[in-house]
Amino acid sequence: MKKQNNLRSLAAQAVEQVVEQGQSLSNVLPPLQQKVADKDKALLQELCFGVLRTLSQLEWLINKLMSRPMTGKQRTVHYLIMVGFYQLLYTRVPPHAALAETVEGAVSIKRPQLKGLINGVLRQFQRQQETLLNEFATSDARFLHPGWLVKRLQNAYPTQWQHIIEANNQRPPMWLRVNRTHHTRDGWLGLLEDAGMKGYPHPDYPDAVRLETPAPVHALPGFAEGWVTVQDASAQGCAVFLAPQNGEHILDLCAAPGGKTTHILEVAPEADVLAVDIDEQRLSRVYDNLKRLGMKATVKQGDGRYPAQWCGEQQFDRILLDAPCSATGVIRRHPDIKWLRRDRDIAELAQLQAEILDAVWPRLKPGGTLVYATCSVLPEENRDQIKTFLQRTPDAALSETGTPDQPGQQNLPGGEEGDGFFYAKLIKK
């Protein structure tokens, strides 16, 4: 491989773009993966995800082992050293190879004069590893979460916050959704077993299967033919609560990338579905998902606060609002969220959610169902949001999910091994 495509330096650049520039890893990583051989793509992903998962520990180690931080044009070296620490702590890469490749990464980022520094810091860590890790185990950084988020979780879940943090710091399981228009879940599990893999059904969500060991999608029976889709179990709860019926007019708002749109159509193939999202780029993935599954829906770009712009005066039998949120329930799947979110974002998101709810409620027919969902675990976006909505909306009633005092159903990450998710099912009187 060409030296400029040193795997460790690419990982360092990816993490730097997330932490310093506020970019999403899902946007940063794919173009970098194009620069490496197929056999190295998984390791590059592991290094990026792993460093972001354990960032506060790696930052703590750098502060212990270096007298001053790397700044300016040398900042990438700061993250390159983190990549070195991560390999030594969490991967099966032999230590000598981890050191050699990480040090060589300095050449790829045009900082060859810092090879000695990188080597020295990593070797110092190896010598002091046990002492450093014992000290780290009593530090505030041990939770691997920003302090503001730890405080919010402690306040919201006095007895469960550590469980949530531990779940967030795990690698996520791989969940699939069996397309019931092609196979029963048990039937597809048989095909999976024939292919030499094992899966387990979810007790509550009828299409959900957890793979014993994550696998590339091309290895899954019938993936290209639309027999199965990658989707977390908790996300599948949206269509379960929505309970779409054939012939109904259904709005899927904030629909990209289309996993819930296609699930609605698997449950009710004759439903008339409008999928709307504000992000035109992400809508391309809705089209891709519909095409792979051989389904049809109307897809439009639009802002949920202004429905007149994308549906005129149309009303719907059912509305799924998968609201923009902090995504604090899916941190194990997207560890960059911990470092992209800020404490002040929560109030802004709650305000946006309230505006969308108020704007779209008049578009629900009397007797119709609206499912409000987020992949957050924070009450400001979930129970508190629905509680205040019910107080100001006299023709809205809660159904199936919770009580007026504690509205909605909150799934915590790791519960039945799904992501953190919230649902509130509302009926228009």
From Swiss-Prot:
PANTHER family on file: NOL1_NOP2_SUN FAMILY PROTEIN _ ANTITERMINATION NUSB DOMAIN-CONTAINING PROTEIN, NOP2 YEAST -RELATED NOL1/NOP2/FMU SUN DOMAIN-CONTAINING
CDD domains referenced in this protein's UniProt entry, alphabetically: AdoMet_MTases, Methyltransferase_Sun
Keyword match Transferase: yes
GO CC term (a single one): cytosol
Region (Disordered) location: 397-419
Enzyme Commission code(s) on record: 2.1.1.176
Record-listed S-adenosyl-L-methionine binding positions: C254, A255, A256, P257, G258, G259, K260, D277, D303, D322
Annotated compartments: Cytoplasm
Single GO biological process annotation from the record: rRNA base methylation
Family: Belongs to the class I-like SAM-binding methyltransferase superfamily. RsmB/NOP family.
Entry annotation: catalytic residues: C375 (nucleophile)
Function noted in UniProt: Specifically methylates the cytosine at position 967 (m5C967) of 16S rRNA.
Chief site of localization: cytoplasm
Origin organism lineage: Bacteria, Pseudomonadati, Pseudomonadota, Gammaproteobacteria, Enterobacterales
Underlying gene: rsmB
Protein name: Ribosomal RNA small subunit methyltransferase B
One Gene Ontology MF term: rRNA (cytosine-C5-)-methyltransferase activity
Residue spans of biased composition, Polar residues class: 400-412
Family matches, as InterPro entries: MeTrfase_RsmB-F_NOP2_cat (IPR049560), MeTrfase_RsmB-F_NOP2_dom (IPR001678), NusB-like_sf (IPR035926), NusB_RsmB_TIM44 (IPR006027), RCMT (IPR023267), rRNA_ssu_MeTfrase_B (IPR004573), rRNA_ssu_MeTfrase_B_ent (IPR023541), RsmB-like_ferredoxin (IPR054728)
